[in-house]
UniProtKB/Swiss-Prot annotation:
Record's protein name: Neuropilin-2
This protein's record includes keyword Glycoprotein: yes
Organism: Rattus norvegicus
Glycosylation sites recorded in the entry for this protein: N152, N157, N629, N833, N834
Organism classification: Eukaryota, Metazoa, Chordata, Craniata, Vertebrata
Segments on the Extracellular face: 23-858
Length: 925
């Protein structure tokens, strides 16, 4: 009985205490309007939250198009254990069934969370065990600032500034600035001030976490990203020629800085009529900024940085931390650029005065900095021969220009250690006449304007076929379709003058295999239309059939294919052959406004002098493999190296031809526009070798780009002039790796008039070069001039021997001057010997005994024998006589030339005369 009142007292105290505690606890959960910013905290924050909590909040925006942003206080403490017991979760909607944006616990505050719609669901749960301080977050409407700061710029010049400049910029901004230029206008952007929040622990440039500025070559997130910038380092000057340059500015809710200010202006581009792709790209001049140069490593003392790798720099050069062929120097050109040549130097240490240089290197290129291709020579990686001392400049010219953005030089051998300075040569695609990018890369062409015959899946849709910027590419439904069955089409929006396409393979995606990631098109055709219904193919002017264009050899490296201008609004590309991985393609169309096009003469070949030229275009590892519909039949189109045809119109410009500098120190071919009152071709400049009768005389060599004609011979034409009596000689030699062959020679005064020379360049399995060699003997006055060297497609081969006297082989050859001392100084070791020529013994001064067989004409003998003795007996006798005649004393007279030119074949007793190539003499029978 006594315990009963005591029990009631305890119960009363318990419930009264519980009531007091409940009155002290803040409300847990609710529905909150984010029109006015507010805070949500765990119960009791910053003290330990209670156990057995289950709080739910719904935060909503007043407008359906508004978003909500949550920012957490860094003081965050919720029991760990993988968030099984205590946790806070945020869902992108108004209930527990909405998409989960995050589930958090532990001691690290969650990052900023932004809703996709106008509602967020927040839930906090705790169990009976240990507790912590909990959380505190701020909710508010997510303000992008787009209405205030996003803007398009179309005026010729202007200023772009961060919102509020020069005051600190606001939080939570996402602004877009777009500069739009008219055709043939270049956009130049230069920053005046730059100060954005950055991470103190930032590893490298572009590693921006909080506030940043992205610059795009085109529409944001469509065109290629040029760079991401933050901190206080001012970006260097940018030059864009695609017609659109965009900036996207992002800020978070924390620290704000002063922002940026930049000036832009538009510059009119007018390409020269005789466009040459050989300009220095800016390593020496500084146009390539320091931030664009990087390396695999740098020597530890900090005196041999990548930024010291500029050609002719006076402060050391670049040296890696360890001398290894795995090290590389990298240059980011920022935009797609035609690379035509590379010049290298070593360096002399300012500390030790020792010379270091690279003796050989490999070249790697990429359009995105991720997928790299090693430049190849056939199936093997091309190894460029570089320097022989620390100061010498050596130029390596690429056989075919490469379209790329990122370039790596990877040293292979070196002297004492790796030290490198360099310059890059080339041009932009848009530098050529009527070669504007019409919008695939920049995004000016919308996704709806790109279509295809079929597509594999969303990631490989036609809209993914944008050059470079796409993360994948177009892939048809059937990876091994019939040739010409599949196509990719671009609607340009309005009629344009179309002059070419840039084709690129497809990049790998998450849903494909490694094999499929290397898909590219090897050969293709192009058709065009003004209305989308009536289509015409680009024609081969020689065959009047649809032209079969060469495609890619690597899935990342783009290739330009040009053709005669055509009016078109719709362009289709038909893959004809492709890699084993199937059809994969990215594309850009080149051209200009319909009224802008005009006939021009353009040459994409480099005109810089070089020490070495590379051999055929680089090939991928899979280049020798082919799908079931792909064959290795050689293209019948003549593919001459860029710069072979040359009229030398501009001083110091020799197209793809080069001087032999090792023998050019005593005299130089000079460009002249003063013909001394004598006729010369079309009143143009030309090359001239001249001597005034001095003791040393003159000797010069002019060397062509590499030529590869494995299937059919062609006719080379040129104009020449030779004055100076018997002391003047001009000859043309074919030089291959293991042999040289004399093709054409004159050694007498030709008068003051210009004359035409024509030579058949025979088919040859190996790559070779054509060399013009001119000699004016010691003590002789004379002049040799050359102009307008070109391959002619309208001259029949039977008419391609001019003058005939230049092909006679009984004119003596020079062997280091032997037997010709009175006419040409033997100091000129012109290597006029011909290892493949018919003879070398028969010269007038040799005193060799003449024979009656030496004077016989084998043609006459053959005709008489076959007419007199009948077909069978005549053939037998003719064979014996030919053998005796040709083999006696090497037969270096006109008789051998006659036999070289003709071959007799018997068909049913009839005699047929057939022209053959001038490659082998009859003495080889």
């Amino acid at each position: 009985m006594d315990m009963f009142p005591l029990t009631w007292i305890f119960l009363a105290l318990y419930f009264s205490g519980h009531k007091v505690r409940s009155q002290q606890d803040p409300p847990c959960g609710g529905r909150l309007n984010s029109k006015d910013a507010g805070y949500i905290t765990s119960p009791g924050y910053p003290q330990d939250y209670p156990s057995h909590q289950n709080c739910e909040w719904v935060v909503y925006a007043p407008e359906p198009n508004q978003k909500i942003v949550l920012n957490f206080n860094p003081h965050f403490e919720i029991e760990k254990h993988d968030c099984k017991y205590d946790f806070i979760e945020i869902r992108d909607g108004d209930s527990e069934s909405a998409d989960l944006l995050g589930k958090h616990c532990g001691n690290i505050a969650p990052p900023t969370i932004i809703s996709s719609g106008s509602v967020l669901y927040i839930k906090f749960t705790s169990d009976y065990a240990r507790q912590g301080a909990g959380f505190s977050l701020r909710y508010e409407i997510f303000k992008t600032g787009s209405e205030d700061c996003s803007k398009n710029f179309t005026s010729p010049n202007g200023t772009i500034e961060s919102p509020g400049f020069p005051e600190k910029y606001p939080h939570n901004l996402d602004c877009t600035f777009t500069i739009l230029a008219k055709p043939r206008m270049e956009i130049i952007l230069q920053f005046l001030t730059f100060d954005l929040e950055h991470d103190p622990l930032q590893v490298g440039e572009g590693d921006c976490k909080y506030d940043w500025l992205d610059i795009w070559d085109g529409i944001p997130h469509v065109g290629p990203l040029i760079g991401k910038y933050c901190g206080t380092k001012t970006p260097s000057k940018l030059r864009s020629s695609t017609g659109i340059l965009s900036l996207t500015f992002h800020t978070d809710m924390a620290v704000a800085k002063d922002g940026f200010s930049a000036r832009y202006y538009l510059v009119h581009q007018e390409p020269p009529e005789n466009f040459q792709c050989n300009a220095p790209l800016g390593m020496e001049s500084g146009r390539i900024a320091n931030e664009q140069i990087s390396a695999s490593s740098t020597f530890s003392d900090g005196r041999w940085t990548p930024q010291q790798s500029r050609l002719h720099g006076d402060d050391n050069g670049w040296t890696p931390n360890v001398d290894s062929n795995k090290e590389y120097l990298q240059v980011d050109l920022r935009f797609l650029t035609m690379l035509t040549a590379i010049a290298t130097q070593g360096a002399i240490s300012r500390e030790t005065q020792k010379g270091y240089y690279v003796k050989s290197y490999k070249l790697e290129v990429s359009t995105n900095g991720e997928d790299w291709m090693v430049y190849r020579h056939g199936k093997n990686h091309k190894v460029f021969q570089a320097n022989n001392d620390a100061t010498e400049l050596v130029l390596n010219k690429l056989h075919t220009p490469l379209l790329t953005r990122f370039i790596r030089i990877r040293p292979q051998t070196w002297h004492l250690g790796i030290a490198l300075r360099l310059e890059l040569f080339g041009c932009r695609v848009t530098d050529a006449p009527c070669s504007n990018m019409l919008g695939m890369l920049s995004g000016l062409i919308a996704d709806t304007q790109i279509s295809a015959s079929s597509t594999r899946e969303y990631l490989w849709s036609p809209s993914a076929a944008r050059l470079v910027s796409s993360r994948s590419g177009w892939f048809p439904r059937n990876p091994q379709a019939q040739p010409g069955e599949e196509w990719l089409q671009v609607d340009l929006g309005t009629p344009k003058t179309v002059k070419g396409v840039i084709i690129q393979g497809a990049r790998g995606g998450d849903s494909i295999t490694a094999m499929e990631a290397r898909a590219f098109v090897r050969k293709f055709k192009v058709s065009y239309s003004l209305n989308g219904k009536d289509w015409e193919y680009i024609q081969d002017p020689r065959t009047q059939q649809p032209k079969l264009f060469e495609g890619n050899m690597h899935y990342d490296t783009p290739d330009i294919r040009r053709f005669e201008p055509v009016p078109a609004q719709y362009v289709r590309v038909y893959p004809e052959r492709w890699s084993p991985a199937g059809i994969g393609m990215r594309l850009e169309v080149l051209g200009c406004d319909w009224t802008d096009s005009k006939p021009t003469v353009e040459t994409l070949g480099p005109t810089v002098k070089s020490e070495e030229t590379t051999t055929p275009y680089p090939m991928d590892e899979d280049a020798t493999e082919c799908g079931e519909n792909c064959s290795f039949e050689d293209d019948k189109d003549l593919q001459l190296p860029s710069g072979f045809n040359c009229n030398f119109d501009f001083p110091e410009e020799t197209c793809g031809w080069m001087y032999d500098r090792a023998k050019w120190l005593q005299s130089t071919w000079i460009s002249s526009a003063n013909p001394n009152d004598r006729t010369f071709p079309d009143d143009k400049n030309f090359l001239k070798l001249q001597s005034d009768g001095g003791r040393e005389g003159q000797f010069g060599r002019l060397i062509s780009p590499p030529v590869h004609l494995p299937r059919s011979p062609v006719c080379m034409e040129f104009q020449y002039q030779a004055m100076g009596g018997h002391g003047v000689a001009l000859q043309v030699v074919r030089e291959a790796r293991q042999e040289s062959k004399l093709l054409w020679v004159i050694r007498e005064d030709q008068g003051s008039e210009w004359k035409h020379g024509r030579i058949i360049l025979p088919s040859y399995d190996m790559e070779y070069q054509i060399v013009f060699e001119g000699v004016i003997g010691k003590g002789r006055s004379g002049e040799i001039s050359i102009d307008d060297i070109r391959i002619s497609t309208d001259v029949p081969l039977e008419n391609c021997m001019e003058p005939i006297s230049a092909f006679a082989v009984d004119i003596p050859e020079i062997h280091g001057g032997e037997g010709y001392e009175d006419e040409i100084d033997d100091d000129y070791e012109g290597d006029w010997n011909n290892s493949s020529s018919t003879s070398g013994a028969g010269s007038p001064s040799s005193g060799k005994e003449k024979s009656w067989l030496y004077t016989l004409d084998p043609i006459l003998i053959t005709i008489i024998a076959m007419s007199s003795l009948g077909v069978l007996l005549g053939a037998t006798c003719a064979g014996l006589l030919l053998y005796c005649t040709c083999s006696y004393s090497g037969l270096s007279s006109r008789s051998c030339t006659t036999l070289e030119n003709y071959n007799f074949e018997l068909y049913d007793g009839l005699k047929h005369k057939v022209k053959i190539n001038h490659q082998k003499c009859c003495s080889e029978a």
